[in-house]
């Protein structure tokens, strides 16, 4: 492949420069095949710690480990050629101190090849965000409904629905920008609040259950295509029923095997040709 035809991956600088220009498309991916599909349209692929719930059947994201995120992040980077890949820092790998956050983030980027990390929090994580960005690690912040903090906030509930909560979310987003974040994910907040944050910040906001006014949107891909039906958030729009398609294919396969119609000759090697064994007579003797 020549230098003129080589695909150029989007950088965090390019993503940041899109503020106010069009809408960023973002989706999640946890594997190389899914990343390859999403990469055809996405500006940003987020390797979310939601992998624990979507792929591993966990009840929440708290059990996801850094090793898991590194394995899935590396797979996504291998599968995606042009999107900016951002990988979540999982629970308990960054909250203790800026130094802990740096160790986790540095290892994650070094072992995956991703372009940035995402962490939950703004105001309380400002020191960590600043510590990372000053040392060359791009950070995407996450405010509003923060799944890693669901136990402390009363579950998966919309945030910013009253003046006090709204002020806290707004301050968190502003703190994240001031600390050096290149983008902010706003999840599960009052629409007017997400709109106000977007109008205030000079970095792109990416909404998930937030506002159409955000600079971009993200959904969990399996939610969007109907491949995960354990729970469907209110803010998800389903564009397909992938589970139904896969279920039909699996049932058809089982039927064909039980009826003896699979495999067909086209699926076999040398079907119908007589068996020839060199040295078979000698072996029998």
From Swiss-Prot:
Q: What does the record give as the active site?
A: 187
Source organism of this protein record: Burkholderia lata (strain ATCC 17760 / DSM 23089 / LMG 22485 / NCIMB 9086 / R18194 / 383)
Give its E.C. classification number: 2.1.2.11
Where is it located?
Answer: Cytoplasm
The reaction(s) this protein catalyses: 3-methyl-2-oxobutanoate + (6R)-5,10-methylene-5,6,7,8-tetrahydrofolate + H2O = 2-dehydropantoate + (6S)-5,6,7,8-tetrahydrofolate
Cofactor(s) needed by this chain: Mg(2+)
This chain belongs to which protein, by name?
Answer: 3-methyl-2-oxobutanoate hydroxymethyltransferase 1
For biological process, the GO terms are: pantothenate biosynthetic process
- Spell out the subunit comment: Homodecamer; pentamer of dimers.
Give me the disulphide-bonded residues: none
| Function per UniProt | Catalyzes the reversible reaction in which hydroxymethyl group from 5,10-methylenetetrahydrofolate is transferred onto alpha-ketoisovalerate to form ketopantoate.
Q: Which key words tag this protein in UniProt? A: Cytoplasm, Magnesium, Metal-binding, Pantothenate biosynthesis, Transferase
Question: So where does 3-methyl-2-oxobutanoate get bound?
Answer: 49-50, 88, 118
